[in-house]
Amino acid sequence: MKTMWRKRKIMFAIGIAILIFIIWNLSWLVFVNFKYKPYTETVPKDKYGTYHIVGSEGYNFNVKKPDYLSLTGNLGSVAPDDICSLIIWPKVFGGYKYGLRIQDNSGGYDIMVDSNGNPIRLDSQSNEEFEKTVEIIQKNKVSIQKIFDKVKSQWDLS
């Protein structure tokens, strides 16, 4: 009798675990499809199964949906001259984080920016590093503004 009761407890626990797993997977699937649908509508899948399109004036746009059971994907755009790239991470509860990659003769720079392209000071940055970041942003302001304008016309990021 005790072993029968014990087996039932174990089967009940396994059933609950499977149910939780199914609910989590379905919740993730619904979230990803709902959250990324507006972005994938304007950037269709290409023949390789990735969301990628070359837009007007040669700007590339791509959508990377979150990997399995992850909630973080991104939107990307690359300028035709490859000097400026913009990565946008949609936040789970609304809003976005923005990052720029700027290439020049002295190398590449990854810079976190706000929705207007202004640099965000990171806690780990020294004054000198932040001043260099501001200088790079100012030097490439036209390219940055243009890529932001292209992205805003491609996706509604309000």
Predicted regions span which residues?
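C-terminal partner/receptor-binding element of secreted or periplasmic proteins
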Residues: I120-S158
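N-terminal Sec-pathway targeting helices
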Residues: M1-I23
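N-terminal export/targeting and maturation segments
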Residues: F21-Y96
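Intrinsic low-complexity, intrinsically disordered segments enriched in polar/basic residues
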Residues: K2, K7, Y96-Y98, N118-I120, ...
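Structured, soluble extracytoplasmic/luminal domains of envelope-associated proteins
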Residues: A79-V134
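A generic signature of intrinsically disordered, low-complexity regions enriched in glycine/proline
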Residues: L29, T50, L71, S85-L86, ...
